[in-house]
């Protein structure tokens, strides 16, 4: 996977995906990250620590691990979520509660998908808890195809969630009208 995917902002109308190295330039990002990460839906469907503290935010605001390309969603100058492309071409994303229901995550997935394909990534995946209807809907609407269950469920905070995989193969992408910007 190319290592400089997140070198430049990606823009779609009012949505900017800001490279993570620039995330601290967003006013109030630390407080917004703490608030978003303590949201019940975020706690339920992600592996963020709970309760999520300023110390957790400071650690997360550092540069991502090697091989991970990460962007912050920014709308009207405010942090509204983040998306990352992990090794193996796996996308992960979340949206702050104040920004949900506006199609931002779908647009972010489309932008990162297009960028990854342009940079030579041949296969992309999204792994989602089976019960996370909102994230599954994003994967489907972004043109990813349901590909079954992952071998191991996710275990966190007393929940055991089966994980489903959505896949986009580059050879499919040009034929799919539902992944166009």
Region locations from a protein language model:
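An amphipathic alpha-helix signature
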Residues: 27-34, 54, 58, 62
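Conserved GNAT-fold acetyl-CoA-binding loop/helix
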Residues: 41-61
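Acyl-donor (CoA/ACP) binding surface of acyl/acetyltransferases
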Residues: 1-40, 67-181
């Amino acid at each position: 996977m190319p290592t400089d995917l997140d070198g430049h902002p990606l823009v779609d109308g009012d949505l900017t995906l800001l490279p993570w190295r620039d995330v601290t330039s967003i006013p109030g990002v630390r407080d917004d990250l703490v608030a978003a990460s303590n949201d019940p839906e975020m706690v339920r469907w992600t592996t963020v620590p709970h309760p999520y503290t300023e110390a957790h935010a400071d650690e997360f605001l550092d540069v991502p691990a090697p091989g991970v390309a990460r962007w912050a969603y920014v709308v009207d100058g405010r942090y509204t979520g983040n998306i990352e492309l992990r090794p193996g071409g796996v996308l992960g994303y979340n949206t702050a509660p104040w920004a949900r229901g506006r199609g931002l995550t779908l647009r972010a997935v489309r932008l990162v998908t297009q960028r990854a394909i342009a940079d030579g990534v041949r296969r992309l995946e999204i792994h989602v808890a089976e019960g996370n209807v909102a994230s599954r809907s994003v994967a489907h609407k972004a043109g990813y195809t349901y590909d079954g269950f992952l071998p191991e469920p996710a275990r966190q905070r007393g929940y055991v969630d089966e994980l489903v995989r959505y896949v986009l193969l580059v050879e499919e992408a040009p034929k799919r009208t539902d992944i166009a910007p």
